[in-house]
A protein has these predicted regions:
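Aromatic-lined, polymer-binding surfaces characteristic
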Residues: 6-169, 174
Length: 174
Protein backbone atom coordinates (compact mmCIF):
# COMPACT_ATOMS: atom_id res chain seq x y z
CA UNK A 1 0.00 0.00 0.00
CA UNK A 2 2.70 2.49 0.98
CA UNK A 3 4.69 1.66 -2.15
CA UNK A 4 1.67 2.42 -4.34
CA UNK A 5 1.16 5.75 -2.58
CA UNK A 6 4.83 6.64 -2.95
CA UNK A 7 4.71 5.87 -6.68
CA UNK A 8 1.53 7.92 -7.09
CA UNK A 9 3.04 10.86 -5.18
CA UNK A 10 6.24 10.73 -7.22
CA UNK A 11 4.25 10.72 -10.46
CA UNK A 12 2.22 13.71 -9.27
CA UNK A 13 5.33 15.62 -8.18
CA UNK A 14 7.10 15.04 -11.49
CA UNK A 15 3.99 16.10 -13.40
CA UNK A 16 3.77 19.20 -11.21
CA UNK A 17 7.43 20.02 -11.83
CA UNK A 18 6.89 19.72 -15.58
CA UNK A 19 3.76 21.89 -15.42
CA UNK A 20 5.65 24.42 -13.32
CA UNK A 21 7.70 25.50 -16.33
CA UNK A 22 5.29 24.70 -19.15
CA UNK A 23 4.07 28.05 -20.55
CA UNK A 24 0.79 26.48 -21.67
CA UNK A 25 0.03 25.08 -18.21
CA UNK A 26 -2.20 26.97 -15.76
CA UNK A 27 0.26 25.70 -13.12
CA UNK A 28 3.21 27.56 -14.67
CA UNK A 29 5.23 29.20 -11.91
CA UNK A 30 6.00 32.90 -11.66
CA UNK A 31 9.70 33.49 -12.29
CA UNK A 32 9.32 37.10 -13.43
CA UNK A 33 7.21 39.25 -11.11
CA UNK A 34 8.83 40.80 -8.02
CA UNK A 35 11.40 39.14 -5.73
CA UNK A 36 9.36 36.23 -4.34
CA UNK A 37 10.25 33.88 -7.24
CA UNK A 38 13.88 33.94 -6.08
CA UNK A 39 12.83 32.65 -2.67
CA UNK A 40 10.58 29.99 -4.18
CA UNK A 41 13.19 28.93 -6.74
CA UNK A 42 15.82 28.63 -4.01
CA UNK A 43 13.83 25.95 -2.23
CA UNK A 44 13.16 24.19 -5.51
CA UNK A 45 16.88 24.29 -6.40
CA UNK A 46 17.69 22.94 -2.95
CA UNK A 47 15.22 20.09 -3.45
CA UNK A 48 16.89 19.27 -6.79
CA UNK A 49 20.28 19.27 -5.01
CA UNK A 50 19.08 17.03 -2.20
CA UNK A 51 17.08 14.54 -4.26
CA UNK A 52 18.47 14.56 -7.79
CA UNK A 53 17.55 10.96 -8.57
CA UNK A 54 13.94 11.46 -7.52
CA UNK A 55 13.32 15.03 -8.69
CA UNK A 56 15.83 16.20 -11.31
CA UNK A 57 17.05 13.20 -13.27
CA UNK A 58 13.56 11.89 -14.22
CA UNK A 59 12.64 15.23 -15.85
CA UNK A 60 12.76 15.40 -19.63
CA UNK A 61 15.40 17.55 -21.35
CA UNK A 62 12.99 20.37 -22.24
CA UNK A 63 11.73 20.66 -18.66
CA UNK A 64 15.28 20.71 -17.31
CA UNK A 65 16.26 23.42 -19.79
CA UNK A 66 13.23 25.48 -18.84
CA UNK A 67 14.22 25.33 -15.16
CA UNK A 68 17.79 26.30 -15.99
CA UNK A 69 16.55 29.24 -18.05
CA UNK A 70 14.09 30.28 -15.34
CA UNK A 71 16.73 30.06 -12.62
CA UNK A 72 19.20 32.10 -14.69
CA UNK A 73 16.52 34.73 -15.32
CA UNK A 74 16.41 35.38 -11.57
CA UNK A 75 19.93 36.81 -11.68
CA UNK A 76 18.33 40.17 -12.39
CA UNK A 77 17.01 40.28 -8.81
CA UNK A 78 19.28 41.84 -6.24
CA UNK A 79 18.98 39.96 -2.94
CA UNK A 80 18.32 41.68 0.35
CA UNK A 81 21.49 41.97 2.46
CA UNK A 82 20.66 39.17 4.91
CA UNK A 83 19.81 35.45 4.64
CA UNK A 84 18.39 36.22 1.18
CA UNK A 85 21.95 36.16 -0.15
CA UNK A 86 21.72 32.39 0.29
CA UNK A 87 18.66 32.15 -1.97
CA UNK A 88 20.62 33.43 -4.95
CA UNK A 89 23.65 31.35 -3.94
CA UNK A 90 21.79 28.04 -3.70
CA UNK A 91 20.25 28.59 -7.13
CA UNK A 92 23.72 29.24 -8.56
CA UNK A 93 25.07 26.21 -6.69
CA UNK A 94 22.42 24.02 -8.29
CA UNK A 95 23.39 25.41 -11.71
CA UNK A 96 27.02 24.57 -10.92
CA UNK A 97 26.02 21.03 -9.95
CA UNK A 98 24.28 20.44 -13.29
CA UNK A 99 27.17 21.87 -15.32
CA UNK A 100 25.81 25.31 -16.17
CA UNK A 101 27.63 28.64 -16.16
CA UNK A 102 27.53 30.12 -12.67
CA UNK A 103 27.52 33.63 -11.27
CA UNK A 104 30.30 32.84 -8.80
CA UNK A 105 30.12 36.27 -7.21
CA UNK A 106 26.66 35.49 -5.82
CA UNK A 107 27.90 32.24 -4.29
CA UNK A 108 31.10 33.68 -2.84
CA UNK A 109 29.43 36.83 -1.50
CA UNK A 110 26.77 34.79 0.31
CA UNK A 111 29.32 32.43 1.86
CA UNK A 112 31.63 35.27 2.86
CA UNK A 113 28.90 37.37 4.46
CA UNK A 114 27.27 34.46 6.28
CA UNK A 115 30.67 33.46 7.67
CA UNK A 116 31.26 37.07 8.78
CA UNK A 117 27.86 37.05 10.47
CA UNK A 118 28.65 34.02 12.63
CA UNK A 119 28.14 35.13 16.24
CA UNK A 120 29.00 31.88 17.99
CA UNK A 121 27.31 28.91 19.64
CA UNK A 122 25.76 27.81 16.34
CA UNK A 123 24.11 31.17 15.60
CA UNK A 124 24.45 33.50 12.65
CA UNK A 125 23.06 37.00 12.58
CA UNK A 126 20.56 37.56 9.82
CA UNK A 127 22.47 40.37 8.20
CA UNK A 128 24.68 42.89 9.97
CA UNK A 129 22.52 42.94 13.14
CA UNK A 130 21.67 39.89 15.19
CA UNK A 131 18.10 38.83 15.65
CA UNK A 132 17.09 35.55 17.24
CA UNK A 133 14.62 34.18 14.73
CA UNK A 134 13.90 31.06 12.76
CA UNK A 135 16.04 31.89 9.72
CA UNK A 136 19.02 30.03 11.19
CA UNK A 137 16.87 26.90 11.28
CA UNK A 138 15.43 26.71 7.82
CA UNK A 139 17.53 29.02 5.66
CA UNK A 140 21.02 29.75 6.92
CA UNK A 141 22.26 26.40 8.22
CA UNK A 142 20.68 24.04 5.68
CA UNK A 143 21.44 26.19 2.65
CA UNK A 144 24.98 27.02 3.72
CA UNK A 145 25.77 23.34 4.34
CA UNK A 146 24.25 22.30 1.00
CA UNK A 147 26.20 25.01 -0.83
CA UNK A 148 29.45 24.01 0.85
CA UNK A 149 28.83 20.35 0.08
CA UNK A 150 28.68 21.06 -3.66
CA UNK A 151 31.61 23.50 -3.49
CA UNK A 152 33.62 20.85 -1.63
CA UNK A 153 32.76 18.22 -4.26
CA UNK A 154 33.93 20.66 -6.96
CA UNK A 155 37.09 21.39 -4.91
CA UNK A 156 36.19 25.07 -4.61
CA UNK A 157 36.16 25.07 -0.80
CA UNK A 158 38.06 22.90 1.62
CA UNK A 159 36.80 19.94 3.60
CA UNK A 160 37.49 22.07 6.70
CA UNK A 161 35.09 24.82 5.57
CA UNK A 162 32.35 22.29 4.92
CA UNK A 163 32.97 20.51 8.24
CA UNK A 164 32.87 23.81 10.14
CA UNK A 165 29.45 24.59 8.66
CA UNK A 166 28.19 21.11 9.58
CA UNK A 167 29.53 21.42 13.15
CA UNK A 168 27.85 24.80 13.57
CA UNK A 169 24.56 23.40 12.28
CA UNK A 170 24.79 20.49 14.71
CA UNK A 171 25.56 22.88 17.57
CA UNK A 172 22.61 25.04 16.60
CA UNK A 173 20.31 22.03 16.71
CA UNK A 174 21.38 21.06 20.25
Amino acid sequence: EEGKLRKSFRTSVLKGLKNGVSPESPDCLNFTRNYQPTVDAAYLAQAFLRAPKALWEPLDTLTKQRYVTAFKSLRRNKPVYNNHLLFAAIIETFLLKVGEQVDQAKVFLACKKIEEWYVGDGWYSDGPSFSMDYYNDYVIHPMLVDIYQVLKEKKIVSERQYNTAVKRMIRHSD
